[in-house]
Amino acid sequence: MTLTTHDAALQPGFMVVHGNRLEALRGLAVEWLRRHPLSPLENETILVQSNGISQWLKLALAENEADGGAGIAAALDVTLPARFLWQAYRSVLSQREGEDAVPPVSPFDKPRLVWRLMRLLPALLDAPVFAPLARFLEGDDDLRKRHQLAERLADLFDQYQVYRADWLDAWAAGEDVLITARGEARPLAEAQRWQAELWRVLREDIAADLGEAGLASSRAAVHRRFLAACRELDATNRPPGLPRRVIVFGISSLPAQTLEALAAVARVSQVLLCVHNPCRHYWADIIEHKDLLRAERKRQRRRPGMPADLAETELHLHAQPLLAAWGKQGRDYLRLLDEFDEQQAYRDLFEGEALRIDLFDSPLHHNAEPSLLRQLQDDILELRPLAETRATWPAVDPARDRSLRFQVAHSALREVEILHDQLLAAFSEDPTLRPRDILVMVPDVDQYAAAVQAVFGRLDPDDPRHIPFTLSDQASRHRLPLLIALESLLRLPELRLSVSDLLDLLEVPAVRARFGIPESGLPTLRRWIEGAGIRWGLDARQRQSLDLPGGMAANTWAFGLRRLLLGYAVGDAADGPWQGVEPYDDIGGLEAALAGPLVSLIDTLEAQWQTLAEPCDVATWGERLRELLAACFLAESDQDLMALTRLEQALDAWQESAEEAGLTEPLPLSVVREHWLAQVDEASLSQRFLAGAVNIATLMPMRAIPFRHVCLLGMNDADYPRVQRP
């Protein structure tokens, strides 16, 4: 079906627009939305890979029409591809098979697989095929290894369901093979056969618990049913849950399963993919060394002058080496897109409105100076090999060309200090440069947060050297005071509970509110604690649990509180020690009202210390942790209230997953703590980016967004690319 008229602008179809500049793709997407708006009560559905892209696109839509925007960014449903995909499954299959055709969650979802694997693994380790797992789990007294292994395996099988569903189908049929990209079946290596066997065990266990309906809820099974149902759809029977238009923007790669689903949805919806492609020529078979997969269909043409037939060993000699070395994901994605892209069906529609579907522009337009960075971008755009690059560009003068710079530092703090100095120099050289034009990316923002706060935060806002900044993408457990305090409380059985530990807790407003301690009372408490000789440890028993000899009660919190309370009781009448306790006499008057809340806090910590130290099942842990939240926190701000709500929701989800998995084994605090806090840190589209200051974030959410200055920290060989160890 060819779309050629103005009336066809919102008709169903699968349309792909390529471009080497994300700004150009954004401009086309905004222009398309402006020219072909949906009805007033319809939401636009936009799929993005991160909140950074989402914010950037919304800001462009909100620009005035004179500046290329739509004037407003409203009625937008911006979501992640996986979430949209599951919603599409439910919409289509519910119309065909009934409301319960696709459950809201599946036993094959990663959070539920974790606890099913936790239960199943111990019974499997005696089988010879699981010997590699048995070796890894040796000496696992605190179950930490088993939990980490279960998480990694659940993540692995979750990825297999998206990217290698054909492997899982073969394993479920009893075939220990791997299916290659050409469809060939190769035997699974002996050391990896446990994966196929474990998948079969998981399927049998789910079938025993939930029957065939449980197996039918796997992602691969639902996907097959969805594709079959979509073949029967047409424009007259579009499911009400499917949007009329779906825009996929700024996503660097999508799995074949998602592209299949989008192509199926395109039978009844308009699907527009804006693909960031750095090269105007076909480069899907220009690869490093011999990693060759040729494609029969190609949207783009080969670069003029390139031989039609290349030996595998010569492919990388006819292209820009960065594309050959680092472009594997992009090559695979372009090859997949070529399988679904029928450009002749929509090219006339775009050209009829003076729009292009191939938005490739040289970075050297308008006689721009050929800096080293622009040369590199143009080499990638034109697919120049190194020999041609040397002949094309003049030699670079390092003294004048500052487009690409490298700095070496001996520590993270020194890296940030150099960054701060470089940014001050950049602002001085270019008065038009603003803090929001600068992006700083790090592999792990939590490792650099303290250094950034120390360097960028040491100057007052009215200081001319002050640079406003925002730390985005930080883990909540390292950013929100309530969660930082909760993590400390969840370490009570292993915590020394020093004076600084307790005072850090009292710096948290929700803790002070729970025990009725005003912020103005903290200096008094510090004076009392120092005067009473308190150092660390709840009492002698808690110190003994940390492998110290019994009976060492001096300078504990119990020791100091006895001195404080005795001093308050006897006042000025104190005449030396009473029953071995020297009263602390600097307590009285209105200040004495703080003694009660301090005693209540210490009593609560002692009760929680005793409770948390004992392993128990998931249901009991749920009761304990809710009691901990109620006993130690009272939310007085919206942020604290939201944090407590998320903690409650994470507890509910954990208990539901463990109950479905049939896990009744007692779990230690270490496993519970890491899982609970990690769930609160799960990535979402609610994080704040592009707040008008220097943006400091991890590489993932911001890497595709263009900024005038891009800085990278932490590019150490062991940190990027990061090696994840089990």
Indicate residue ranges for each PLM-predicted region.
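Polyanion-engaging groove/track-forming segments
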Residues: 1-726
